[in-house]
From Swiss-Prot:
Enzyme Commission number(s) of this protein: 2.3.1.274
Subunit structure as annotated in this protein's UniProt entry: Homodimer. Probably interacts with PlsY.
Keywords: Cytoplasm, Lipid biosynthesis, Lipid metabolism, Phospholipid biosynthesis, Phospholipid metabolism, Transferase
Pathway as given in its UniProt record: Lipid metabolism; phospholipid metabolism
Subcellular location as annotated: Cytoplasm
Record's catalysed reaction(s): a fatty acyl-[ACP] + phosphate = an acyl phosphate + holo-[ACP]
PANTHER family named among the record's database cross-references: FATTY ACID/PHOSPHOLIPID SYNTHESIS PROTEIN PLSX, PHOSPHATE ACYLTRANSFERASE
Similarity comment: Belongs to the PlsX family.
GO biological process: fatty acid biosynthetic process; phospholipid biosynthetic process
Organism: Granulibacter bethesdensis (strain ATCC BAA-1260 / CGDNIH1)
Gene Ontology MF: a single term: phosphate:acyl-[acyl carrier protein] acyltransferase activity
The protein's name in its UniProt record: Phosphate acyltransferase
InterPro entries, per database record: FA_synthesis, Phospholipid_synth_PlsX-like
């Protein structure tokens, strides 16, 4: 196995993603296979595969395409699913830690892991730190809707948020939607208990007012309710981590219930089975639309580097999709674009309050 750094190994025109080979329920097998699938779709991408070399060697022999586009860095320790974040922070030779360190040292532009969520979030925040002007990173993910894929954030990284946090999430969501969903002017909504302007608490109303006077004013739809998420009223739904996580888990539970009910209904009688055969084409499209693998890959946005969290129980196709998300974020310079968005917000805030300090931070701090 090559010991040189990923940055040395590949030419300057390619970008490198660090892969935590040991994270997830079925690692490292599905990780290497998923990386191989992603490599076929993205021939310019290169990988720094971090994990136990003795386990990775036979897998890379099985997937020569993956072997040809990666270097391996030995990491003998795995962060387990039951491990507390504090314990994971002490494991300096874990595959997760070394993969994130590679991003911090400039050897990789992003990291993908299917490992312990709490440990990944804690390590990423401490090692990579937030971008200038960002108070807190947010967890963002793609979800299905009646009008196509949408983006929602925060999904649980921040339970309590102030107005400025929500505005930062909107800026980061705008960049994510442009980078991954390919939208030129994503419509942005704030999740609230009603769509009327007077609804919600001071925190959510202040955030809405800040967005109406920001560079995202033309894209800001206003308040959205729970049913607007599935309806696709906006392309980006912004929420605090408490509300966002509940909305996500509710959507996942509803999708599972729907799948179970359809299976129960279409296997209940002979006529029902016949009905399934007649409706098979449409039902297969519905199954594909609801396939969680299509939406695998939540991103911790707002850090100095791209961090993608894959579902721990996914298969190779699902992990490959998480890698796809990481590649989209890196190739579209998402971190740079978030910096630009924050700079515009500060500039507009300063222009609106010229008597305050030059960078507008007094007005922004007032919103906390």
């Amino acid at each position: 196995m090559a010991s040189k750094t990923a940055a040395d190994h590949f030419n300057r025109d390619s970008f490198v993603l660090a892969i935590d080979a040991m994270g997830g329920d079925h690692a490292p097998e599905i990780v290497v296979e998923g990386m191989a699938i992603a490599a076929e779709r993205h021939p310019d991408a290169r990988f720094l595969l971090v994990g136990d070399e003795t386990l990775l060697a036979p897998l890379l022999a099985r997937w020569p395409r993956a072997a040809s586009v990666c270097t391996v860095r030995h990491a003998p320790v795995k962060v387990t699913g039951e491990m507390k974040a504090a314990a994971a922070l002490r494991l300096r030779d874990s595959s997760m830690r070394i993969a994130i360190d590679a991003v911090a040292h400039g050897e990789a532009s992003g990291v993908v892991s299917a490992g312990n969520s709490g440990a990944l979030l804690a390590l990423a925040k401490i090692i990579l730190k937030t971008l200038p002007g960002i108070d807190r990173p947010a967890l963002a993910a793609i979800m299905p809707s009646a009008r196509g894929d949408i983006l929602m954030l925060d999904l649980g990284a921040n339970v309590l948020c102030d107005p400025r946090n929500l505005v930062e999430f909107a800026i980061m969501g705008d960049v994510f939607a442009r980078s991954v969903l390919g939208l030129t002017a994503p419509r942005i909504g704030l999740l609230n208990v009603g769509s009327e302007e007077q609804k919600g608490d001071d925190r959510i109303r202040t955030a809405a007012e800040m967005l109406r006077t920001s560079h995202l004013a033309q894209q800001f739809h206003g308040f959205v309710e729970g049913h607007d998420i599935a309806g696709g009223t906006t392309d980006v739904v912004v929420a605090d981590g408490f509300s966002g996580n509940i909305a996500l888990k509710t959507a996942e539970g509803t999708a599972k219930m729907l799948g179970g009910l359809l299976k129960q209904i279409f296997t209940s009688t002979i006529l029902a089975r016949l009905g399934y055969l007649l409706a098979r084409g449409g039902l297969e499209r519905l199954r594909e639309w609801l396939d969680p693998r299509r939406y695998n890959g939540a991103v911790l946005v707002g850090l100095n580097g791209v961090v993608v969290k894959s579902h721990g129980g996914t298969d190779a196709q699902g992990f490959a999709h998480a890698v796809d998300v990481g590649m989209d974020m890196v190739s579209n310079r998402s971190s740079d674009r978030i910096r630009e968005g924050i700079a515009k917000l500060v500039e507009l805030s300063g222009a609106a309050h010229p008597a305050r300090d030059k960078d507008g931070t007094a007005q922004l701090a007032e919103a906390r």
